[in-house]
Amino acid sequence: MNTATETVQLTKFTQVLCSSGSLGIRIRKRNDKEITNYISEIDLKHFKKKFLNS
């Protein structure tokens, strides 16, 4: 997967997180690097299943 595609997938994932109430509120207060680090702590199996295989 190229970087542009990865960026689009990460953006889609972040938008979903931001639409999920208080979790999204916390994420919106973080900068890009912190968002990336935070997402890396989330269940990446779910991320890959939902977005990378679509």
UniProtKB/Swiss-Prot annotation:
This is Putative uncharacterized protein DDB_G0275657.
